[in-house]
Amino acid sequence: MKNILGVIFLIPIFLLTGSNKPIDAIYSKSDLSESELVKSDTFLTNEYTPSLEHPGILHNTKSIERMRTVVHKANATDPAYQTYLLMRNDYRAKSDYQLKGPYEYIARQKDYAWTKRNYEADFGAAYLNALMWIITQDESHATKVMEILTKYADKLKGIPNHNDAMLLAGFHAFQIAFALEMVSTTYDKIQQTDVDKVNNMLRNVFLPWLDNFYSIPPFSNGNWGLIVSRAYMGLAILWNDTEMYKKTIKFVLNGYDNGSFPKYIDEETGQCQESGRDQAHVQLGIGAAGSICEIAYKQGNDLYSALNNLVMKGYEYTAKFNVGHNNVPFKTWTDVTGKYSGWNTISPKARGNYRSIYGLAYNHYVIRKGLNMPYTKEMLDKNNWLGKFDGDCIDFDVFQFNDKDLNN
């Protein structure tokens, strides 16, 4: 259908790809045999059921108390506290943040590309103010979150049918879901009508693009599937939707898409599907994979250890090259789409440009589980163990995910 401006919305992308009908990307051409697939689906159904704990998207009551303890101790030599100060001083984390939107339509490109910088700041502010609320209990942060979200809910009509629509939906549906989850489950003055309004925006504007991604043939680099899946899992928890949650699990463990764990990360070396593309996108992808694992972990499911700690291997490979080591193996493989198979060397583009993703993985594999991640540690050492804002939804991760003082 068209709006009065002539911009096309919600046309199934398979119409743009030449396919006659949508294909379920979750199950198409699985590498598993039929018997293994049945076993896998049975395992997924029985073992990967969310606890539906609230709050429960990236953070639960225990991790919130841990963050509050770090702030209360105010140890100036603690990187977690130093990272908290960086977060607190970010303009997007201020309760007096000045909203730049809202807009009727938002996009990353073409006619509405001019909105991108502003809505990214607005949704980033909702995310960071939600964190500041659960840490400080200063009501001004909770009200700022709901101001941002409800104003967008009142005005936002759609995401134009551009190439990046699904990626946009993945990034920002997650930020919105996280912010709404943190405030709606912990702030007793919230108005249910406001919560309903924001949920309607998520269902009517963002969710159709996420569903669309799952219903079409694979077409993108792997970070897309991981970003979409993180948003889908977050919405599943927000809405207490076990089937949505399990759909995400099936995709990341068994999906025929560059964004599933086994298609994104080589089981032998940890090389990632985008390692030959550039280091910015591969860090984006592996960070999204790590955050999916953390969301599931907070819901009682261990994706971190899945496929023999596959996500850890991806982190270590990526950290090793980005910290400066050249002796990393590289092989050219045929990706799921066949479009991104020409890379014959690891890419030096954006090499060493640190993204705030490594503290998350180090916290789980080393602090919680006692495993070794020498290259991830080297990356953190090189960057003084400080997190930062990347807009990737695990910003300031050294503060957010640091369980060294807890018995995990």
Regions found by a protein language model. Give the residues of each.
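Amphipathic alpha-helical repeat scaffolds
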Residues: 130-131, 230, 234
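Secondary-structure capping and boundary motifs in well-ordered enzyme cores
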Residues: 168, 224, 278-285, 307-310
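Extracellular glycan-targeting catalytic surfaces
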Residues: 27, 31-215, 250, 273, ...
